[in-house]
Amino acid sequence: MLRHITFTVFITTSMNTLATGMVPETSVLLVDEKRGEASINIKNTDDHPSLLYTTIVDLPESNKSIRLIPTQPVIRVEAGQVQQVRFLLQATVPLQSEELKRVTFEGIPPKDDKSSRVTVSIRQDLPVLIHPASLPEERETWKFLEWRKNGDQIEISNPSNYVVRMTLQFKTLPSGKTGAINKTYFLPHTSTTTALTNATDTKVEFYPASRYGYRGNKYVTDLK
């Protein structure tokens, strides 16, 4: 019996990623509240047409009252063609701090009941950064992070109105001991704790991520 089977491959695009299928033009979707909308170009790099499915995904900490709605959640994209996907921002009150969500783009190839081949659908997963109209632009958001000793733990907090993104690992200085956090982002006014490996260290070294998810130069700050 002839069978046609489709598998989905899930790709998180946060740094430089090479991929096939439906490929976004950038590694992050930036949304400005002033405009009330955003758009991104998606290219179908396959040699066949596919249906492009666009889905906004809330993080566990996301503000569910802030909604970003794709105007065309499902659309056919021909082979080699570029499709612009537009999003509308909906919020009940003006935003005071940045919001982080995710968006997935998945290309579903046409079904051929007479074929026995196995096809693979690629799902791209990008961060969505929503910036309030009243908040000044800030490129170096990581400088707002506060690192404090608390017993045998380090408490890392983000008291700012900005989303901060960084790599998972960091070092405490001068010992050079390595530590790690459990996620690569800090939403505004959130904090986390991790193990303190050397109580005498007074500095922290880590690598922040740019707005587009690229790893920046190392940054050193106080461990209080």
From Swiss-Prot:
A Pfam family assignment: PapD_N
UniProt-recorded Gene Ontology molecular function terms: protein folding chaperone
UniProtKB keywords: Chaperone, Fimbrium biogenesis, Immunoglobulin domain, Periplasm, Signal
GO CC, one annotated term: outer membrane-bounded periplasmic space
InterPro entries per record: Ig-like_fold, PapD-like_sf, Periplasmic_pilus_chap, Pili_assmbl_chap_C_dom_sf, Pili_assmbl_chaperone_N
Superkingdom of the source species: Bacteria
GO biological process: cell wall organization; chaperone-mediated protein folding
Subcellular location, record wording: Periplasm
Signal peptide annotation: 1-19
Main location: periplasm
Biological function: Could be required for the biogenesis of a putative fimbria.
Similarity-based family: Belongs to the periplasmic pilus chaperone family.
The protein, known as: Uncharacterized fimbrial chaperone YhcA
Organism: Escherichia coli (strain K12)
